[in-house]
Regions:
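N-terminal acidic leader/helix
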Residues: 2-35
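Terminal, compositionally biased segments
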Residues: 1-12, 63-73
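Short, charge-rich amphipathic interface segments used for partner binding and complex assembly
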Residues: 26, 35-73
C-alpha cells in the first residue's frame, strides 16, 4: 500500500488547512481573545505548520496558510 496521497486526499487536506486559516483569521481579527480562543489559535497554527511541511502539495496556494501562521504566532 502506498503512502502517497491521492488528489482527493490532498484536496481534503487543503480544505482542512483552509478551515484552520479561516478560524485563525477570525479569532485574530477580534480585539481580544480568551485563553481558550488563544489556545485554539495555537493549535491551529501548529496544524498549519505541519501541513505546510508536507511534500505532497502540487499547485495548491500555500500563501494563506503561511499568512495565518504568521498572524497567529
Amino acid at each position: 500500500m502506498s503512502d502517497t496521497p491521492t488528489a482527493e486526499d490532498i484536496a481534503q487536506h487543503y480544505s482542512a488547512a483552509m478551515d484552520s486559516v479561516n478560524l485563525i483569521n477570525a479569532l485574530m481579527a477580534q480585539d481580544s481573545r480568551t485563553t481558550e480562543e488563544q489556545d485554539t489559535v495555537s493549535r491551529n497554527v501548529e496544524h498549519l505548520q505541519i501541513m505546510v511541511a508536507k511534500d505532497y502539495w502540487t499547485t495548491e496556494d500555500l500563501t494563506p496558510l503561511n499568512n495565518a501562521i504568521t498572524a497567529g504566532s
